[in-house]
Amino acid sequence: FKQNCVSIQYLREMRRGESGKNALIPSVLLRGCKSAPDLRQITLRLDDLYGASVSPISRRAGDYQASGFYVSLMDDRFALEGESVLEKTLDFVTELLFDYPTEDGGFLKDFVEGEKINQIAAIESELNDKRVYAAQKLLETLCGQDPYGVPKMGTRQEVEAITPQELLRHYEALRRESPVEVYYVGSADPGRVAELVKRMFAQEVREPRELPRQTDLTPGVRQDRREAMEVAQGKLCMGFLTPITNRDHRFAAMQVTNGILGGDVTSKLFQNVREKQSLCYSIGSGYYAAKGIVLVSAGIDFDKEDHVRREVLSQLEGCQLGQITDEELAASKQSLLTALRSVQDSPSAMENYYSAITMAQ
């Protein structure tokens, strides 16, 4: 690749009351450091590094939340006069991580309040996307008090209540206590990359705490949850809990099964419920491998809800009984193989893939 990437992320158990802070911190850090105190100065510094970019990371990894930076930079092979773009970029990232301005015992108020507005807007955008909103509410209901049910950006109320002082105290705890995961994709010698990363954290006083192991969900009683809204099209989500997670030896078989059920346009749900019977506008299934959840989502007319429910259960039963054609099996396998091959298409895809695998353990 001509472009390399580095991700640096702190891992924390997903907790209510903390997830919003974890998501907010990287964006606040990217507002400025002492040597580049505003967005304009940061942009100029990155331009000098052959157009490198630094983006905030806030993502769910099973029971964990990852917060930090994703860095894209030019490979050293293409730099002028043997310049080390990697070394200089990581030096600047170190400043962004640890050399931030403070006031009154907290982050700069303008930085925090500005990023709170952005994060609240992102939270509310999920409400406007009814498919995403319905899926999140189903996961919250299905997971109960499990960490996987915690919204990764927090709630509006939680974010509004964050103060600059509270946020800085939380970040100091992250720096001190949280395990750090670093991923690099590029042509540099691994030993050299490791030394550069060690140098980044050389001045840190750390007492990292071991994270609890990823947990499995316990099946509960069936629940129905409804929310009335002024919308033209209803969103039906159905969640099914399986005993097969990405830590199970049957993981690959479960991926294939989900593909057959509702993974794409060749699936049972799409072909039978949407195409043949015209019962919905859209339908598909997703496999949340960290918890073994299969989630079916459909856009429907309100008067067709019961019919769609029955048909979803009928197609699921067909999979359970082995009523799967050779064509359905081949199509699901091919879709998964195509997705796996595409991992090697870009540094970002490789970083995301290996990061997810490592943190799932």
Give the location of each predicted region.
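Short, surface-exposed recognition loops or helix-turn segments adjacent to catalytic cores
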Residues: 104-116, 133-139, 154-155, 185, ...
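Short, low-order "capping/linker" segments at domain edges
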Residues: 121-125, 221-235, 338-347
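His/Glu-rich zincin catalytic helix
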Residues: 1-50, 81, 155, 164, ...
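M16 family metallopeptidases and their MPP-like homologs
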Residues: 2-22, 40-95, 99, 131-154, ...
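Short helix-to-loop capping/linker segments positioned immediately adjacent to catalytic or ligand/cofactor-binding
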Residues: 104-106, 123, 127, 179-185
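Glycine-rich, mobile lid/loop segments that gate access to catalytic sites or pores
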Residues: 119-127, 138-142
